[in-house]
Amino acid sequence: MTEYKGFGKRWKVIRADGEIVTLEDGSKWQVSDLMDRPVEFDPGDVVIISQGAPVNPKICKINNLTQNRELTAVLVQP
């Protein structure tokens, strides 16, 4: 299993199909909610993929479908 190289970088969401989002680097992610309300992504949203747990009201859990890793993503306003 190779280490994901996109940690700490800003990635634009280019496609969002329900809980599946595709980032501009081509990686596909499955979004699961950490809060009491659902987290939805739209094309054009920018996310930072992080291995930590940053404090942000729009934190969601995001799963890398290609590497079976559970990570934390912070939604950044474009």
Model-predicted regions and their roles:
Residues 22, 39-40:
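Residue-level "contact hotspot" at macromolecular interaction interfaces
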Residues 23, 31, 48-49:
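A generic structural signal for residues embedded in beta-strands
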Residues 28-37:
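Short alpha-helix capping/helix-loop boundary micro-motifs
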